[in-house]
């Protein structure tokens, strides 16, 4: 209730609607958010990256990988309806997975949460072929719970989700580095260090990436910033010394 008192009332984002084709509810939902983020993406392109014909759908790992290929971080939302509302209030549509069937006979469905009305306890979603579909809080929460509260906020490197915390954000950013998208990883690490300048982890991530790229000047500068926040961390001092040594030998 405290969170709800801080929210705008009511709220509805102008998210482009893309009606799903065939079994493309996931690609259509992702394409809607990509368009909202000013990216030119269509459901066919996203389906080519994520759709599994044998499953007649897109599984969550493929959906996240497709988002990263578009340059969007799929930040994992906490299992919190309040955080979901908070993201929408901050201007972030949320990609959600619902189970519209039963636990023993699931009917998986992706949708985009884009608005709410607290007074009537109504949520608004782009869902399948239905734009701005109205659903009660209770009904949504039931279908969301049966999908284990799966939700992702898709953001570019210029935005940080309203409910983001440093370590989950950096883990999500690291997925870009692990898949070879180093320029994007660098951009998200930079955003983390700007958004949480007193947290050493963002500076450490930037330092390690710069070190791996052979940029010892940047690596030593970022290690130094990390040490300012965590001066008692021996491993940081070691890494800083290695970077300084490599820089002097270059």
Predicted regions and their residues:
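Noncatalytic regulatory segments and standalone regulatory/sensor domains
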Residues: 1, 118-204
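Structural marker of alpha-solenoid helical repeat scaffolds
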Residues: 195, 229-230
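Cysteine-nucleophile protease catalytic domains, especially the papain-like/related folds used
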Residues: 2-80, 84, 90, 159, ...
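Active-site-adjacent substructure of cysteine-protease-like catalytic cores
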Residues: 73, 77-126
């Amino acid at each position: 209730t405290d969170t709800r008192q801080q929210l705008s009332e009511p709220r509805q984002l102008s998210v482009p609607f893309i009606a799903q084709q065939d079994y493309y509810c996931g690609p259509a939902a992702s394409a809607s958010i990509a368009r909202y983020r000013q990216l030119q993406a269509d459901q066919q392109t996203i389906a080519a990256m994520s759709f599994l014909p044998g499953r007649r759908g897109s599984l969550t790992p493929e959906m996240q990988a497709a988002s990263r290929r578009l340059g969007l971080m799929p930040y994992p939302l906490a299992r919190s309806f309040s955080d979901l509302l908070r993201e929408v209030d901050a201007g972030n549509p949320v990609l959600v997975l619902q189970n519209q069937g039963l636990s023993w006979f699931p009917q998986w469905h992706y949708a985009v949460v884009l608005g709410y009305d607290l007074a009537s306890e109504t949520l608004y979603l782009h869902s399948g072929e239905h734009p701005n579909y109205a659903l009660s809080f209770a009904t949504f929460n039931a279908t969301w719970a049966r999908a284990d509260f799966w939700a992702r906020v898709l953001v570019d490197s210029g935005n940080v989700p309203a409910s983001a915390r440093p370590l989950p954000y950096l883990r999500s950013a690291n997925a870009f580095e692990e898949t070879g998208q180093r320029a994007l990883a660098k951009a998200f690490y930079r955003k983390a260090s700007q958004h949480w300048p007193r947290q050493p982890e963002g500076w450490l991530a930037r330092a390690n990436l710069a070190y791996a790229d052979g940029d010892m000047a940047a690596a030593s500068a970022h290690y130094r910033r990390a040490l300012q926040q965590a001066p008692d961390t021996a491993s940081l001092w070691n890494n800083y010394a290695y970077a300084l040594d490599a820089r002097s030998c270059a």
